[in-house]
Curated annotation (Swiss-Prot):
Signal peptide: none annotated. The lineage of its organism: Bacteria, Bacillati, Bacillota, Bacilli, Lactobacillales. This is UPF0297 protein PEPE_1262. Belongs to the UPF0297 family. It holds the Pfam family IreB. It comes from the Bacteria. InterPro entries: IreB (IPR009309). It comes from Pediococcus pentosaceus (strain ATCC 25745 / CCUG 21536 / LMG 10740 / 183-1w).
Length: 93
């Protein structure tokens, strides 16, 4: 069997995760700069889907709308759980 007969695998997951992380950082900074509580505003957006929770400052509103809300939630859960697992392993040692 030649190399051309083998199934190729393409995974763009890490790039998408990094993109979501960068977007969340930008949105968080924009919300802080405007004087809003970033956590409350991001949660409001994720629950409602209403982009009015996110300011236009630094193009934050357009950036967050590039991602599906479920993708953002998935990344937040992934990050939270990985931190919790890492912390519990530190406590075991």
């Amino acid at each position: 069997m030649g190399k051309l007969d083998e199934t190729m695998f393409f995974d763009f997951g890490d790039n998408k995760q990094n993109d979501v992380r960068e977007t969340l950082k930008t949105v968080y900074d924009a919300l802080e700069e405007k004087g809003y509580n970033p956590i409350d505003q991001i949660v409001g957006y994720l629950i409602s889907g209403d982009p009015a929770y996110i300011p236009r400052l630094n193009d934050a509103r357009n950036l967050i709308r590039k991602h599906q809300r479920d993708e953002i939630i998935e990344e937040l859960v992934r990050y939270y759980l990985s931190e919790q697992i890492a912390d519990s392993k530190k406590e075991e040692n």
